[in-house]
Regions:
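Structural recognition of the conserved hydrophobic beta-strand(s) that form the central parallel beta-sheet
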Residues: 73, 98-104, 125
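Conserved lysine of the Walker
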Residues: 31
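Pre-Walker A adenine-sensing motif
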Residues: 1-15
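Hydrophobic anchor at the beta1->P-loop junction of P-loop NTPases
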Residues: 23
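Short regulatory helix/loop adjacent to the ATP-binding pocket of P-loop NTPases
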Residues: 107-122, 138-139
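Accessory nucleic acid-recognition modules appended to NTPase machines
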Residues: 158, 162-316
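Domain-level recognition of nuclease-like catalytic cores that cleave nucleotide substrates
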Residues: 354-379
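Hydrophobic positions on the alpha1 helix immediately C-terminal to the Walker A/P-loop
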Residues: 34, 38
Length: 379
């Protein structure tokens, strides 16, 4: 079992704030392994995929009263008939108990969940392997970009095409169909594969519907399902009401670089491919470090674009530019952004080794750093 201290620390921090932690992430991202890393002495593990789990939890009060461990893990809890009731009883009647509930979607994904846990749960979004975890996996950054960060693919000696195909079929059958009752696998997969090929670019619903020959409402409902199940992140534009800012057009980032390179047929990777895939790793680092915060980008009508921005206090907005090579940075867009928002830090994120350092480019002060600055923002 690979030790993942980043996520273990995040779990403990979340439990210090609320009794229930919802560990969400796509299929095969390592949720079960992370849950089992708590150990049998500390935690009671319940696999909700098994029919016996429903019978075991028929009387939740009795179940929790008989539990002799401080932590209960409900793996794939959405498979239960009434998961909300189980979690509510745990939070209300057994406040000292800590619960880890896992699923491949957010709590909002299923009609089985009601909003009865306000203030008593914390979301932990388990993204594919972070750059800071690559040493533990025995993988290089090149492997992470090419294979992706789902542990079975990342640990494979060569890129396994069958893994990606099987995952896509399983994702539809076990997540999409069960949660949303979509029936047309061909139409759904056509949209998903289109999104994978367009990943990292702006996503226009009307253009997508036209390209695939399906209705706009169908595209919107399928995109919503992908977003809820965390297979897709829509990065929406940040704006403060300034004239000339883009306010509506989102960019779409698929959940894993391995699937993006697989769908695009990138074999081997070229330098231009690495730059786009590096952006995906930045999105995942944002999600891991600041769970619950939306990821934003900035663009004006003149075409100047800053890869990612993060508001940090009143009138203070940090800017993040991503480059596979730090030497390729062009400050034009960042200078335009700072005319709108003069306060904030500027980061140039590149796959550098060693410590972060500062530099000045055309009057702009930059911090050049790797993703460790995002993955460990408080250190």
């Amino acid at each position: 079992m690979i030790n993942r201290p980043f996520w273990q620390e995040r779990m403990e921090q979340a439990w210090s704030e609320a009794p229930i932690v919802w560990l969400a992430g796509v299929r095969r991202s390592g949720k079960t392994t992370l849950a089992q890393s708590l150990g049998a002495e500390r935690s009671l593990y319940v696999n909700c995929d098994l029919p016996a789990a429903e019978d075991m939890l028929r009387d939740p009060v009795l179940f929790f009263r008989q539990c002799d461990r401080p932590v209960v893990v409900f793996d794939e809890i959405h498979q239960l008939r009434d998961p909300s009731r189980v979690l509510k009883i745990a939070a209300d009647e057994f406040p000292k108990l800590r619960v880890l509930a896992t699923g491949s979607s957010t709590l909002a994904a299923s009609k089985k969940f009601r909003d009865t846990l306000t203030g008593r749960k914390r979301l932990l979004h388990l993204v594919p392997a972070l750059t800071g975890e690559l040493t533990a996996f025995g993988a290089t950054l090149e492997q992470r970009l090419y294979h992706g960060g789902l542990p079975p693919a990342l640990l494979a000696a060569t890129k396994p095409p069958a893994f990606y195909r099987e995952w896509l079929d399983s994702f539809f059958a076990r997540d999409i169909q069960r949660l949303f009752a979509f029936r047309d696998i061909n139409r759904f997969n056509a949209l998903f594969e289109y999104v994978l090929r367009q990943s990292g670019g702006q996503l226009e619903v009307t253009k997508t519907a036209s390209a695939l020959g399906i209705s706009r409402p169908t595209v919107e409902s399928h995109l919503q399902a992908l977003e809820i199940t965390q297979a897709l992140t829509l990065v929406r534009p940040f704006h403060g009401g300034g004239q000339g800012e883009i306010v509506r057009q989102p960019k779409a980032y698929a959940f894993d670089t391995g699937f993006v390179s697989f769908a695009r047929g990138w074999d081997p990777l070229r330098p231009a491919d690495r730059g786009l895939l590096w952006e995906h790793l930045v999105v995942e680092a944002f999600q891991a470090s600041w769970p619950g915060e939306p990821v934003r980008y900035w663009r004006n009508k003149a075409g100047d674009e800053v890869d990612f921005v993060r508001p940090r206090g009143r009138d203070v907005v940090d800017a993040y530019e991503c480059k596979w090579s730090a030497d390729e940075f062009d400050p034009t867009a960042l200078k335009a952004f700072r005319e709108y928002y003069p306060k904030g830090r500027n980061y140039l994120l590149a796959p550098i080794t060693g410590r972060a350092y500062g530099k000045k480019v055309q009057g702009l002060e930059l911090t050049v750093c790797g993703l460790a600055a995002l993955e460990n923002p408080d250190r």
